[in-house]
Structures are given as C-alpha cells and as structure tokens.
Amino acid sequence: MKEKFLALIAAVSPADHSLSGAAQAHLDDLTKPQGSLGRLEEIALRFVQATASLSPVINRKKICCFAGDHGVAREGVSAFPSEVTPQMVYTMLSGGAAINVFARHVGADLAVVDMGVNHDFPDHPVLVKRKVAKGTGNIAAGPAMSENEAIGAILAGAALAAEAHDEGYHLLGTGEMGIANTTPAAALYSVLLGVPVDGITGRGTGIDDERLQHKKEVIKRAVGVNAGLCTTPLGTLAALGGYEIAGIAGFILGAAACRVPVVVDGFISSAGAVVAMKLCPVVADYLFFSHLSNEQGHRAVMQALGARPILDLDLRLGEGTGAALAMQMIEASVKMYNEMATFSSASVSEKDGE
C-alpha cells in the first residue's frame, strides 16, 4: 500500500507553463481591452496550464462529497449530534440538500462518498462506498487513525479521481459532510501551516461562545496529545484528520496526476487540499479555491497558501456548495477563451498605436 501511495505522489507533474506565452497572446488578441476580463483571464490561463492544452474543454463536471464521522464529536464541539451525518447523507441521496440543488443548477454530476460514516447505507446510484472505518478515533485522546488507514483513504480518493478522468470529466470539485469536522480541520491547519488555534477555530455549525472556547481547548489538547505523531504530513493527517479529509487529499492528488483541475470547496475541503499540497507541492497548480468561507480562520489559511478564492459569499455550509458555484465562473472563463472573436480574425480596430 505504501508503494502505491508513493507512486501516486510521483505521478503528479507540474502544470505546463510552457504554454503560458501562447495562451496569454491569445487572451490579449480577444476582442476586448487587454486584461479587461480580470480574473476570468487568469483562470483561463491557469486552466490551459493545468490541462496542458491550448484548446481546453469542459464538457463534463463532477463533484464528490466525501462523508465521515469523528470521534472528537464526543467532546461536544458541535451544535449537532453525530447522527446528523448519516441523516444528511440520506438527504443528499434523495436530492434535497443544498449541494444537490447547486449541482443540478450548474450541470455537475454528484457522487456522495462514504469514507467513514458510522452507519451502513443501502446501495444507491449516487452513493460510493469506500468506508475505511466507522468514524475516527477521538483526536483529543489519541490519533484519529493509523497511517495505513490514512493511506487507504488517500488511495480511495485518488482512484475516484482517476475513474472520473477515464469517464471524460474535465473539471472536478470537492465537498464534505461530517459532524464536528471543523475541529480536525483546524487542528490540521494549526500543525501544517503553523497558525494559532485561537485564530483558526470558528463556530462551525453555530456554537455559542462557551462551546467555542471549549472547542479551542479540545483542539489544543489534540495537538498536544498527538505531537509525537505529527512529524510528517502523512503522520499529521493520520493523527488529527478525518477519513473524508484524507479522501479529499487523495482525490486532489489523483486528479492532478491525470491533469484534471479541481475546485476546492470551503474550510474542510481546504484542509484536504493543504494535506495534498504538503505531500506533493505541485498539486497547487491544479487547484482552484472556490470561495472564502465565512468560517473563522479560512482567510488566514488562504493567506498562508498565497491563494485567492474565486468567490466571497459568506458561505459556511460545505457539502461542495461553493465548489459548484465557482464551477460556473471557471466554465465561463474557458468559454471566453475558446469562443470570443480575436482582433486577428474580426474586423475590429485595435487600440491606437498597436
């Protein structure tokens, strides 16, 4: 299993920056003042680089929502009980969750991936069963999982990305569902990015001031208890993470290995992205951070990564909702790149002096 994990990381190559000159020249030749479409031009350029194609396409889009339960929920860090995780999975399977609505709106297919929910689901066409275990260990008392379990979750996520590539998807998105998962996400950020727990920890599902302070203490305890295990990115993931977070990290690695761009959702999905980037820094070339989450600390994470999210809508739901909405912006960017007329081909006068 470790060999497959190392092979996955080795399979990721940087984006093709040799195409930058030609792609930028094409963008500048489009019938508009140069740079007037702002970040849409930047997005199109990055998409060309990631896909290594001067004629990029987005014919199919898919969002994978990874679900898992967390032992640390027993510490009372969430406003909701763990039973809500399988309940929300069922809502997604029935088509009634926010991510279902948004995925339908943007024309993206949706898969709900059971990475570690403490429940046995019946078969369903939208459900992908990749359960590693029925929930993680309580990180406030010890590690979330073993390194082998973390690798297993990573490889499962990577395989889903490879399958999506083989099925003809050109743009992938991440989502998640798991009560209490802002707690392991904050713990991972604290260790992997060196940000203070107090500044990275937010209210998650809407906890009050007293429970927020308790949550911060739980995270600090988790980081302290597991300090000896957090010597590598993989060890840190195993000690403090979640099965859905590990699945997202693998999904990103697998997509990057296939040169498929990934739209990262919010606070928890970004933790999976940080894990992937720490394991293999060049995956950053393939990531589009969808939105700035309203969850406290996400801004600090984006600043630490030097990332600029596409949207800022005060979202804090997760599920892949922000990723779905940002897919529209990316798709518009690629259509702009491909479908606009150029000064070279159209009877449009260029700027005086050119």
Swiss-Prot record:
UniProt superkingdom: Bacteria
Pfam families hit by this protein: DBI_PRT
Record key words, sorted: Cobalamin biosynthesis, Glycosyltransferase, Transferase
EC identifiers of the protein: 2.4.2.21
Catalytic center residues: E319
Catalytic reactions on record: 5,6-dimethylbenzimidazole + nicotinate beta-D-ribonucleotide = alpha-ribazole 5'-phosphate + nicotinate + H(+)
GO-annotated biological processes: cobalamin biosynthetic process
GO molecular function, one term: nicotinate-nucleotide-dimethylbenzimidazole phosphoribosyltransferase activity
Pathway(s) annotated for this protein in UniProt: Nucleoside biosynthesis; alpha-ribazole biosynthesis; alpha-ribazole from 5,6-dimethylbenzimidazole: step 1/2
Keyword Glycosyltransferase among UniProt keywords: yes
Cited SUPFAM superfamilies: Nicotinate mononucleotide:5,6-dimethylbenzimidazole phosphoribosyltransferase (CobT) (SSF52733)
Class of the enzyme per the UniProt entry, highest EC level: transferase
The keyword Transferase appears for this protein: yes
Family of this protein: Belongs to the CobT family.
Protein's job: Catalyzes the synthesis of alpha-ribazole-5'-phosphate from nicotinate mononucleotide (NAMN) and 5,6-dimethylbenzimidazole (DMB).
Protein name per Swiss-Prot or TrEMBL: Nicotinate-nucleotide--dimethylbenzimidazole phosphoribosyltransferase
Species this chain originates from: Chlorobium phaeovibrioides (strain DSM 265 / 1930) (Prosthecochloris vibrioformis (strain DSM 265))
